[in-house]
Amino acid sequence: NLIGLLTLLYAGTTWKILDKSFCFKYSKKNTRLVFIFIVKMLKQLSISAGNLLNKGTSETLRNEITTKKVSIHLPKHLKPANDSQFGHYLAGLIDGDGHFSSKQQLIIAFHSLDIQLAYYIKKQIGYGIVRKIKDKNAILFIIANSKGIERVITLINNKFRTTSKYNQIINNIFAHPRFKEFSKTITLGLNSNNNLNNHWLAGFSDADASFQIKILNRDKKIEVRLNYQIDQKKEYLLSLIKDNLGGNIGYRKSQDTYYYGSTSFGSAKKVINYFDNYHLLSSKYISYLKWRKAYLIIQENKHLTESGLSQIKKPHPYRKNIN
């Protein structure tokens, strides 16, 4: 006789243990071996039962079951540690607010609050100027030097993700005679990797994201919503973010734009996990801290109290408004 497939009833659910042909020829000699095997499988089931249970639950419930709480301790704020990390951050920043112009320049726009970030970018690249735009709360970081443009392209190659920036480099930079030799030394490519385990999203968010806290009063019940939002003309980058962080994508017909929002508490947790590891460098970091603190209050259900709600409503001491 052969023992070809073993099933057992565990925690009220029938679990299929052997999907492959694990067979034991029956004999008195190996009866003990079969018994040991069954015991080991039972132990494995007891360890993995929680994971298997999650397959049948909704995303919200699954998050409640498995999500480890966000720590009240804030990680030390760090900048990218090397050219590779900085290249990912710069690629995200350029994908969001950068432009390779027909004058063979790189131009990145910043809010006037982020002038220190503009000078940091200049220092890391080693080229460029920072220029204030008259009568506007904006500044420009501009690189016109050939060596500076070449360094930027080397830094972001295989790290940036937008086809528009790829086409700008091909048509506005490589097509110009002074970059002819450089274009022969580099194989330009987009980052097609689907994970976000680098600084790209931090740079992209410093350019285009906002951290929103919405307090709603519905049927005499207070509801606090945390929304990390990004608006784009194209949907594909938002789909990448959604695949990694959860959330939803919408479309505004009147503006012909798509928007991503981290609408659930579980998605907010994933947003925090990312930005606690890959830090924002602009003034949006202050907005993120306020947003993160609101999450901690909700996490402990303190938003249901007057004191907790007042803490969420309180302006951040270092900034009056949330981006």
Curated annotation (Swiss-Prot):
What is the annotated localization of this protein?
Mitochondrion
Main localization of the protein?
mitochondrion
Could you state one GO biological process linked to this protein?
intron homing
Top-level lineage group: Eukaryota
The leader peptide range reads none
Single GO cellular component annotation?
Answer: mitochondrial chromosome
GO MF, any single term: DNA binding
What Pfam family is a match for this entry?
LAGLIDADG_1
* Protein keywords: Mitochondrion
Another remark in the UniProt entry says:
This protein is coded in group-I intron 2 of cox1.
Indicate what this protein is called per its UniProt record.
Uncharacterized cox1 intron-2 37.2 kDa protein
